[in-house]
């Protein structure tokens, strides 16, 4: 069936939306693919829905190819299963919560590990039923604090989530790698540039976890990689290579110095290099201690101190990942007033440990390393405080920023950073959820076997924006043929009746051959039609213009910009060959 622009429910815009920040947000609205309804909530118009459905179909094909079976669970969920796993609390404010008329707590589902585990428990009881992979393509809901970038980070989004269930860890690993391969095929078919990185599991739980990140300067996720080895990881998952412990014997004794008004690392370093210490001091020789209060889900606030080398900032994402599922806040004025042993700007390990404050340090703070740090009195710091001799931390924490040039955890070279957009995440959950719901089946030996579970997600609606981010140009969208709303866009740029009739005939013949045709039969000017064709982004554009009288039309490649004249008599064959 030919789609006529004169009848299509679409309105293009010439100007970018005032609140749009990234190219995909601007272009998808300008081209009439989506429309905003509320912050983080969008309507899908016909063009956008066509692209979304094509991506969904690619995902379904590859999921079916690894033995996945599609089901559909409700988005409106009861509280009880999520209370059992504590995620009703762990998800905090990101959950959309509501009550029914009987005052029962309900929620809009952000993810479905619990429900899939319960579904399998209710249907299967023997090892003979496994392995099994179930999946759904469904709308999810998360109450993002700051929805942004259009459909890249919304509060309502379409996601493919699949779950594997096996009777052994080997089976889980096989399902995990099957999904990993399927995801690579999916993203390859979409023509995406992406990288697979080691990741943290967060509130999902489990052991092994990897993210698929589409490379983009507008991405919210920072990842690092080692060019020499191919190592790649989300910054939250980078493990700092700890230096070897150093001998303590013979090291200078710790001495407290009057340092004056030196509450910052910069002022402390200036003092140290003018104090006659006999060496040049840099920020890396200092140890700064950050005070937080942390609270486990359902628990009370507790103090936590984090010590990092003074040349490093604390990375909020790494800190949050290290503390998850606990929430945390920096101490404020009222908190410092409550704990007089905490002298802001001069906090050191001694007072922290003496007052029972949990103290975690960067992995670089190893036994035998010597530091300049606070002496717990105004205007005083201690020089040559040695880890393992003068203080012993309660443990380590991966909270310091990761920088370009840092050594790769695999020892093969240096790290370089880039930005990306998360498009997929795979987890080996293990038995976190099957333990919670006692999902056992009868094993081959007649004894109960606890199932092991994997979880695998793809942001389907987000992929629409990601393709737009990677493939657009200054003129508009450029859709790969696999997901383009149409195969070819036929533009009638000649008012001659014969030319219009020829365009109709060409469109009809292409349609008969099974191609999806968008025909611009509007009475608008050629300039308006050309701009819209470039904005809408169909990969092949056929222009029926002034050359019609000479027996030629134009075939334009939206990706390369190349235009070639083709004979009217060969038009169907030439366009079909180009479309492939």
From Swiss-Prot:
Xref: PROSITE patterns: AA_TRNA_LIGASE_II
Q: Which reaction does it catalyse?
A: tRNA(Pro) + L-proline + ATP = L-prolyl-tRNA(Pro) + AMP + diphosphate
SUPFAM superfamilies according to UniProt: Class II aaRS ABD-related (SSF52954), Class II aaRS and biotin synthetases (SSF55681), YbaK/ProRS associated domain (SSF55826)
* One Gene Ontology term of the molecular function aspect: ATP binding
Q: From what superkingdom does this record's organism come?
A: Bacteria
Question: Which keywords does this chain's UniProt record carry?
Answer: Aminoacyl-tRNA synthetase, ATP-binding, Cytoplasm, Ligase, Nucleotide-binding, Protein biosynthesis
What's an example Gene Ontology biological process for this entry? prolyl-tRNA aminoacylation
Indicate the enzyme's highest-level EC class: ligase
This entry's Enzyme Commission designation comes to: 6.1.1.15
Q: Could you tell me where this protein is found in the cell? A: Cytoplasm
Which InterPro entries does the record associate with it?
aa-tRNA-synt_IIb (IPR002314), aa-tRNA-synth_II (IPR006195), aa-tRNA-synth_II/BPL/LPL (IPR045864), Anticodon-bd (IPR004154), Anticodon-bd_dom_sf (IPR036621), Pro-tRNA-ligase_IIa (IPR002316), Pro-tRNA-synth_IIa_bac-type (IPR004500), Pro-tRNA-Synthase_IIa_type1 (IPR023717)
Q: Name one GO cellular component term.
A: cytosol
Does the record carry Aminoacyl-tRNA synthetase as a key word?
yes
Q: Which family does it belong to?
A: Belongs to the class-II aminoacyl-tRNA synthetase family. ProS type 1 subfamily.
PANTHER family reported in the protein's UniProt record: MITOCHONDRIAL RIBOSOME PROTEIN L39/PROLYL-TRNA LIGASE FAMILY MEMBER, PROLINE--TRNA LIGASE
Cross-referenced NCBIfam families, in alphabetical order? PRK09194.1, proS_fam_II
Per the record, the domain comment is:
Consists of three domains: the N-terminal catalytic domain, the editing domain and the C-terminal anticodon-binding domain.
**Role description:** Catalyzes the attachment of proline to tRNA(Pro) in a two-step reaction: proline is first activated by ATP to form Pro-AMP and then transferred to the acceptor end of tRNA(Pro). As ProRS can inadvertently accommodate and process non-cognate amino acids such as alanine and cysteine, to avoid such errors it has two additional distinct editing activities against alanine. One activity is designated as 'pretransfer' editing and involves the tRNA(Pro)-independent hydrolysis of activated Ala-AMP.
Q: How does it assemble?
A: Homodimer.
Query: What is the name of the protein in this document?
Result: Proline--tRNA ligase
The record lists the organism as Mycobacteroides abscessus (strain ATCC 19977 / DSM 44196 / CCUG 20993 / CIP 104536 / JCM 13569 / NCTC 13031 / TMC 1543 / L948)
* Name of the encoding gene: proS
């Amino acid at each position: 069936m030919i789609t006529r622009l004169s009848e299509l429910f679409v309105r293009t815009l010439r100007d970018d939306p005032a609140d749009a920040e990234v190219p995909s947000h601007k272009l998808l609205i300008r081209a009439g693919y989506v429309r905003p309804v509320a912050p983080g909530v969008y309507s899908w118009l016909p063009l956008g829905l066509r692209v979304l459905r094509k991506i969904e179909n690619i995902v379904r094909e590859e999921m079916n190819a690894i033995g996945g079976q599609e089901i559909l669970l409700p988005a409106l969920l009861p509280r009880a299963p999520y209370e059992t796993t504590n995620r009703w609390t762990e998800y905090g404010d990101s959950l959309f919560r509501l009550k029914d008329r009987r005052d029962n707590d309900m929620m809009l589902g952000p993810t479905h590990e619990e429900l899939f585990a319960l579904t399998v428990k209710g249907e299967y009881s023997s090892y003979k039923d496994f392995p099994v992979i179930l999946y759904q393509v469904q709308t999810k809901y998360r109450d993002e604090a700051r929805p942004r970038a259009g459909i890249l980070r919304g509060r309502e989004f379409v996601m493919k989530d699949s779950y594997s269930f096996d009777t052994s860890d080997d089976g889980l690993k096989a399902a995990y790698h099957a999904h990993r391969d399927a995801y690579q095929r999916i993203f390859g078919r979409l023509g995406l540039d992406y990288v697979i990185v080691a990741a943290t599991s967060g509130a999902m739980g489990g052991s092994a976890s990897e993210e698929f990140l589409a490379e983009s300067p507008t991405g919210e996720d920072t990842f690092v990689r080692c060019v020499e080895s191919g190592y790649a990881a989300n910054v939250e998952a980078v493990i700092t290579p700890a230096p070897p412990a150093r001998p303590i014997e013979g090291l200078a004794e710790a001495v407290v110095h009057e340092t004056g008004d030196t509450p910052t690392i910069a002022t402390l370093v200036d003092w140290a290099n003018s104090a006659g210490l006999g060496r040049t001091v840099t920020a890396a020789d200092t140890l700064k201690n950050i005070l937080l209060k942390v609270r486990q889900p359902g628990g009370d606030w507790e103090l936590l101190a984090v010590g990092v080398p003074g040349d490093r900032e604390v990375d909020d994402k790494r800190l949050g990942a290290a503390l998850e599922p606990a929430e945390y806040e920096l101490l404020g004025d009222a908190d410092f007033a409550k704990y007089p042993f905490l002298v802001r700007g001069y906090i050191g390990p001694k007072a922290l440990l003496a007052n029972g404050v949990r103290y975690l340090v960067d992995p670089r703070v190893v036994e035998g390393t010597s530091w300049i740090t606070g002496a717990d009195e105004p205007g005083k710091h201690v020089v040559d405080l040695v880890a393992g001799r003068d203080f012993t931390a309660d443990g380590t924490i991966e909270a310091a920023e990761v920088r370009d040039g840092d050594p790769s955890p695999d020892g093969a070279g240096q790290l370089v950073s880039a930005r990306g957009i998360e498009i997929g995440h795979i987890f080996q959950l293990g038995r976190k959820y099957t333990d919670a719901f006692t999902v056992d089946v009868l094993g081959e030996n007649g004894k109960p076997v606890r199932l092991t579970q994997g979880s695998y997600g793809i942001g389907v609606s987000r992929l629409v924006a990601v393709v737009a981010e990677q493939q657009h140009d200054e003129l508009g969208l450029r859709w790969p043929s696999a997901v383009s709303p149409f195969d070819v866009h036929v533009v009638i740029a000649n008012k001659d009746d014969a030319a219009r009739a020829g365009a109709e005939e060409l469109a009809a013949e292409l349609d008969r051959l099974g191609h999806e045709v968008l025909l611009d039969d509007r009475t608008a000017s050629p300039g308006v039609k050309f701009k819209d064709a470039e904005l809408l982004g169909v990969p092949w554009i056929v222009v029926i213009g002034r050359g019609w009288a000479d027996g030629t039309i134009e075939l334009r490649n939206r990706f390369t910009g190349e235009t070639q004249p083709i004979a009217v008599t060969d038009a169907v064959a030439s366009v079909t060959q180009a479309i492939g």
